[in-house]
Amino acid sequence: MAKKWLNKVKWDDNGLVPVIVQEVGTNDVLMFAFMNRDALQKTAELGEAVFWSRSRKRLWHKGEESGHVQKVHEMRLDCDEDVVLLKVTQVDNIACHTGRHSCFFQKFEGDAESGDWQTVEPVLKDPSQIYTAKP
């Protein structure tokens, strides 16, 4: 039987919904990703973030390789029912594959003519130490 709460989500033509991940406590926006029905269902079951990887075409349990899982405290649906917000605790404080706290580590500084994107968050851990080849 279809779950009513999953049917309420307005999925796009590819069966996906955009997801914003926000840290509990700081309210920092950590990342943006997509979920399909299975990913949202798994997230609710596990209490940890599971996304749909568009490049790998498979479910992606956040932290499955790095250990940097996201413990979900709350799931919210926006007013148009087409965007999900996850409020999470980020394990080891690293959400980004670059080894940073947030994927939003570049800030626009300057004006429209001469401005540029500046890196404003440090690398907390070298990605080569996070993602190692599996035997």
UniProtKB/Swiss-Prot annotation:
Binding positions for Mg(2+) per the UniProt entry: D78, D80, D82
NCBIfam families the UniProt entry points to: PRK00051.1
InterPro entries noted in UniProt: PRA-CH, PRib_AMP_CycHydrolase_dom, PRib_AMP_CycHydrolase_sf
Record's keyword terms, sorted: Amino-acid biosynthesis, Cytoplasm, Histidine biosynthesis, Hydrolase, Magnesium, Metal-binding, Zinc
UniProt name for this protein: Phosphoribosyl-AMP cyclohydrolase
Superkingdom assignment: Bacteria
Gene Ontology terms for molecular function: magnesium ion binding; phosphoribosyl-AMP cyclohydrolase activity; zinc ion binding
Compartment(s) where it occurs, according to its Swiss-Prot or TrEMBL record: Cytoplasm
Pathway assigned in UniProt: Amino-acid biosynthesis; L-histidine biosynthesis; L-histidine from 5-phospho-alpha-D-ribose 1-diphosphate: step 3/9
Subunit structure: Homodimer.
EC number: 3.5.4.19
Signal peptide per UniProt: none
